[in-house]
Every structure is written in C-alpha cells, then in structure tokens.
Amino acid sequence: NLGSAFLANKTNRMFVSRKEKENWNMYVMDLDKFFADVKQGKVGKPSAYETFIGTFPTEMGRPGGYAVDCNDDYAYITVEREGTEEEKERMMKNAFLPESNQPVKIKPTLCGIRKMNLSTGEVTKVIDTEFKTGHIQASRFTPGEIVFCNETGGDAHQRMWFCTADGTVFKPLYKETPLDWVTHETFATKDFVYFNILGFQPRLRKQASGIVRINLRTDDVELIGQVELEKDRQAIDGQLVGRGFWHCNASRDNKWAVGDTFGGNVWLINVQTGERHWLVSDTKMKPDHAHPSFSPDGTKVLFQSGHFTNGKRLNLMMVDISSFK
C-alpha cells in the first residue's frame, strides 16, 4: 500500500503518506538505495528503504492531500475539521450555488491546512478555511508559499487562494467575476500561477477565456491564449470538441505554456509571442485527462494518452520541443 507519494526537491528521496489502521503516517524513502537493490535484483521489504517521520494527530483534523516545500522541510497537508456552529452557518451561507444544469459534486466542508516538520514529525496549524480545500501546491522556488483551491467539483465564487506557511498571508488569488469559471491552477514558476478560465459553455464565451497567468507579486493578470472554440459550431450536442482549454502548465522559464483541450488535443503556446503549435491530437481524455507538463529544463512536454488503447488505459507520452523557437 504505497499511499500518496511526493518526490523530494533536493535529494533522491520520496515522501510517502499511508493510512495504517487509524493512523495517518508519513515516511521518507531512500530511492538511491532502492534502485541500487533493483539493479542487483535483490529488493527488500519497504522497511529496508523507508524511515518513519511522524503520525498526524487526530485532533488536528482529518488529513487529505499534501505538497512538500521547496526545501523539503515541511509537508503542507489539507484537512477536514469539525469547527464551530458559527463557522458551519457562515460556510453554508457563503457556499456556491451552481447553475440549474450544474450538479453539486463536492459539498462544502470546514477545512484547513496544517504543516508537518519532515525532520521531527511535529504538526502545527497554518490556516483554517470555511470551504472544501484541495489541489494544494507549494512553490518549487520560494519557501513557505502555498496555492490551493475551493474544491466544488465545478465552478466556485472564488476558486484560487494563496497563503504563507506561517499563516500571516491568506487571500484570494485572482478575484473572479460571475462569468469566470476558473480551474486547474498550477504553481508553475517562481512568480506566476497559470490557470484556465473555461469557455466550454455558450454563456462563458461572452468574455475572454483560455490559459491565463497571474503575477503573485503584483496581482497583474495576462491572457496567454485560447484555441478550438470555432469548432463548437460544428459539434454534435454532447461532444467535447470545440470547448477550448481544460488543463494547463508552463515551463519554469515562462517561455512556454501548454494546455489540453476538451477535444483531447495538446497545444503549445509561446508566452512571449502568442504563437500556437498543435502538438498532439486524439488523446481520448479517458480514462483520465492529458494533463500536460514540462520537464524541468523546459525542452520536453509530458502527457497522458488513451489514444493507443481506445481510452481503456493510459500511456505516458513525451514530445521533444527543443527545436521550437
């Protein structure tokens, strides 16, 4: 039972969380030792490679997903919590009410973020929230910077949020308008968070949509690009072609952005010039989405594809973009 895994940023290790009986435990795995044994054909038990870090205290909440700080000092962990009756009343009063044709996939829940010291196992509070907190990400470049979302399974009044690990900063990131359907934010570079404003419904195409980025230091917002919306007029009802971008990412030098579309295509965009390149088609977007991302040096795009299995299983695919200008 591997549980949730997160590769360390500084060393060849992997942090692993595991639910064992009633405990949520964190371990760190020595990958150098593990792969050396794999090479020799003598892999041992998990205990031969893992070191126990700590157990999450039950009084701190029910832990969920987590991200690891860029210095590998802390894990930032989302939790569900009980809270007070006053908090629950505020939560329900402020909860997002979707359009009539949108299901409520994830109900609001009192949540928060805790941090675990990855040397000592100590757990302390970062912030409490009054909405379902998910998609937590830590900056790969600046210690103590955290991006997360109000997870509804669909639209939200305000999806993206930012906080610092000491809890002194806790604020909305990109203040939304009623026609903004924000999704799939990614803490891609030192100063920018990239995200999508969806255009997959006619009502959403009455303003700009596509891949967008926000500057964490200035709150300035830039539209990077959109594709394929013109195909919507040719689509049969129920098809996902012509709905624009769904997920996005960016290279660490901010030169390139990449996105997959509802129709299963992957596009590359030059952030400086706006030039668009159609990299891949027909990833099927099932059994999961393409979710493209970049190699650390920005020369390759990695994505998932169900193309070769007719959507039954996923293959990991990679495209070399080093020749693109």
Labelled PLM ranges:
Residues 1, 31-61, 116-132, 163-181, ...:
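Multi-bladed beta-propeller domains
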